[in-house]
């Protein structure tokens, strides 16, 4: 426990185009080497491509994609008596969002399309339809938690 006061979480400014804090956070996740304007271009282009293909509102599709990627449980390593157990734990809401965004971006970076905007758009479309690499990652994490349910009593 820290002796000083607990520092609160910083408020993030909403993005300029859609006025969304979620999208601003997503831009920060995509950003590399501090190049925020490049990250914004990538995301806005990807959202335009997705909205054109789906015919829905930009943020609705992003929210649907993130909903299908958000994990509810994960495993954490816990050392008990010389052996390490994978203990299933519930994921806090802030971490759920962070993991979902990170997994979406990682999956998009591994895709084969030409530009990052197209890769991200493809991954968001796949995630919105409950398929794709990011959704598979979430299901793998859930499967690990389910397999280690016997160690749930070691939760802290």
Curated annotation (Swiss-Prot):
Part of the 30S ribosomal subunit. Contacts proteins S9 and S11. GO terms for cellular component: small ribosomal subunit. Keywords: Ribonucleoprotein, Ribosomal protein, RNA-binding, rRNA-binding, tRNA-binding. This is Small ribosomal subunit protein uS7. InterPro entries: Ribosomal_uS7, Ribosomal_uS7_bac/org-type, Ribosomal_uS7_CS, Ribosomal_uS7_dom, Ribosomal_uS7_dom_sf. The keyword Ribosomal protein applies. The keyword Protein biosynthesis does not apply. One of its GO terms (molecular function) is structural constituent of ribosome. Pfam families: Ribosomal_S7. It comes from Shewanella loihica (strain ATCC BAA-1088 / PV-4). It comes from the Bacteria. One of the primary rRNA binding proteins, it binds directly to 16S rRNA where it nucleates assembly of the head domain of the 30S subunit. Is located at the subunit interface close to the decoding center, probably blocks exit of the E-site tRNA. Belongs to the universal ribosomal protein uS7 family. One of its GO terms (biological process) is translation.
